[in-house]
Amino acid sequence: MKPVLASTLHDPQNRLESLINEQTPKLEELFHEKIVTLSSSTSRETLQTLKKLGYEASYGDKSVASTYILALRRATEKKIEPIFYCDFDRLLHWTSHYPEELEAVTQKSTHDFTLFGRTKRAMLTHPETQTLTETTAKTLASKVLGFPETRDVLGTTWMLKAQQAEALIRAKISNQYGFYLDWPIRLWINSTNPGYIEVEGLEWETPDRYQQEITQAGYDAWKENYQNMQEWKKRNLMLRDMIEAIATHIQFNKST
């Protein structure tokens, strides 16, 4: 059976409307149901576009984690498995640039939980504010999980069962961003047959929103907007929260 899509989207300026319209026919072929939960600041136009196209779309609360939780909860209510979670802007980029890859990974699964990570090439498309801080978190998480090499635990893309999603919904959220790492660790530890797949389609999706600005300024100059001090502070805050989440699992392992 086709999976249920559980997804979240933050788009305050409705920049992705044309891409949503273009790519929805492809997504309709891949997913049995399409659920998208929006951040509280996402534009009303985006909500209207999604509903018009047949998505089950609604707003989440102000916290980032609550938006993810609502998407997973609505997916579990469908009583259909598996559930495929991917941030919606990433999914739009994936299906527009690597449609065959997306179709392949969504239509066949031999694991009760599949963690999707970025290939080395896909990871390097992101700005250093992201690659450098995430490398620290991924290295620590990979050691906690006993991987022989560092894996991209932060792709925030998973194929999972409803029972696993329900466990995430019940899990305690201890800080703002730690769930990005806490959840995949929990899913992997509590799965009987977990799998890991690296994909090209999870390359950096943000440029899709800013094609006009990129055309005017040039790609390298535009990308510098994500290398400023404000962005470094944001990414370091995320890293701090994720390290706290990892510490919880290290303490748990020691106690057992």
Residue ranges of each PLM-predicted region?
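Active-site nucleotide-sugar/metal-binding loop of Leloir-type enzymes
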Residues: 69-82
